[in-house]
Amino acid sequence: MISITEWQKIGVGITGFGVFFILFGILLYFDSVLLAFGNLLFLTGLSLIIGLRRTFAFFFQRHKLKGTSFFLGGVAIVLLRWPLLGMLLEAYGFISLFKGFFPVVFGFLGSAFNIPFLSTLFQKLQGSSSSMV
C-alpha cells in the first residue's frame, strides 16, 4: 500500500476545492473571480500532491510545451478577466496535457460503473488500450 503524506492529503483537498470553484464559476456564467481562484487552487493542490519538482517536470516536458503554454496562458487570461477565452485556451491545454491519462480514466469508469449502457460507452471511449497500469 502506498503511504500518503499529510501534504498530499491537503493537496487533494485543495485540488478538489479548485475543481469545485472552476465548475461553480462556469455555472455562474464564467465568473472570472471564481475561475481565477479555482485555477490557483487547482495548480497549488497539484503541486502539493506530486511535489514542485515533479510538477515542473510534468508541465515542461518537451512534447508537452504546447499544451502547457495553452493551459498556463489560459490561466493568465482568466486572471486578466477574460474568462471565456481563457477557459477555452485552458480546456485545449488540459486535453493536450492529459490526453495520455484519458484511456486509463475511461477504463476505470467503465469497470467502476457496471451499468450496461455506461460501461459500453466508456469502453468505446477508452479505445484500444485496456491496461489499468
UniProtKB/Swiss-Prot annotation:
UniProt main location, coarse: Golgi
A GO cellular-component term linked to this record: cytosol
Entry-linked Pfam families: Got1 (PF04178)
GO biological process: endoplasmic reticulum to Golgi vesicle-mediated transport; protein transport; retrograde transport, endosome to Golgi
Superkingdom assignment: Eukaryota
Record membrane topology: Multi-pass membrane protein
InterPro entries associated with the record: Got1, Vesicle_transpt_Got1/SFT2
Membrane-spanning segments: 10-30, 32-52, 69-89, 93-113
Stretches in topological domain Cytoplasmic: 1-9, 53-68, 114-133
Annotated compartments: Golgi apparatus membrane
Protein purpose: May be involved in fusion of ER-derived transport vesicles with the Golgi complex.
Entry similarity comment: Belongs to the GOT1 family.
Name of the protein this chain belongs to: Vesicle transport protein GOT1A
